[in-house]
Structure formats: C-alpha cells, structure tokens
Amino acid sequence: MSQIDKASRRQKIKDRSRAAVAGTAVKPRLCIYRSLSQIYAQLIDDSGSTTILAVSSMSKENKELKGAGVEVCRTVGRQLGEKAMAKGITTVVFDRNGFRYHGRVKALADGAREAGLIF
C-alpha cells in the first residue's frame, strides 16, 4: 500500500469517526496524533473550539524520555490523565484520529485509564 493510499485511508476513517464523535466542556474529546518519532494528545472542547489540555512526548516534563515507544506513550497517557483529573475532568470521548487501536495508541489510552480517566 503506497503512502498516498495510507494517508487517504486514514483521512476517510478520521472523517467518518469525527461525524459521530464530539467533545463538550464536561466530556471533552481526547484526540491523539502519532508521528514516526513522537506522540501528541489533546483534550478538546468542540462546542467552544478550544483545547483544554495538551501533552506530548516533546513536553518539558518529558525531556528525559527518548522517542515515542510503547512505554513513552503509556507515560504520556498517564500524565494526561493526571492533569485532566486535576482540572476536574473524569470522562472523555476517545478519538483515535484514524489510527488503529494497537501499539502506541493503545498504550496511551491504557495510561490515561490508569490515571483515572473513563472512556
């Protein structure tokens, strides 16, 4: 499968799931992005078009972590969950952004659940 086909396939999946998934201030959308070397996660309020919280493997508190392997993704998910709980957010809607729920995406979700987020 060529790179263009992969990108267009992911975009179609993303568009289809975005039609069904929306975040609010009470139950924001946990949106992830996985690049080859990093992982990013945001809590987004779609009704107000604002980002409530953002954590990535490039954050200042993650300087000692190298790459974006499964363990790094689990740590990023745990940090996101802890920061969300501190802001009073307990439930979220998970948006995998067209990526398969496997490997690093699953590790980030598991880390967020370990910290107490419900989805």
Swiss-Prot record:
Keyword ATP-binding: no
Keyword list, A-Z: Ribonucleoprotein, Ribosomal protein, RNA-binding, rRNA-binding
GO cellular component annotations of the record: cytosolic large ribosomal subunit
InterPro entries referenced in this protein's UniProt entry, alphabetically: Ribosomal_uL18_bac-type, Ribosomal_uL18_bac/euk
Coiled-coil boundaries: none
Recorded GO MF terms: 5S rRNA binding; structural constituent of ribosome
UniProt-listed GO biological process terms: translation
Any matching Pfam family: Ribosomal_L18p
Cited Gene3D superfamilies: 3.30.420.100
Superkingdom, taxonomy of origin: Bacteria
Function: This is one of the proteins that bind and probably mediate the attachment of the 5S RNA into the large ribosomal subunit, where it forms part of the central protuberance.
UniProt family annotation: Belongs to the universal ribosomal protein uL18 family.
Subunit structure: Part of the 50S ribosomal subunit; part of the 5S rRNA/L5/L18/L25 subcomplex. Contacts the 5S and 23S rRNAs.
Name of this protein: Large ribosomal subunit protein uL18
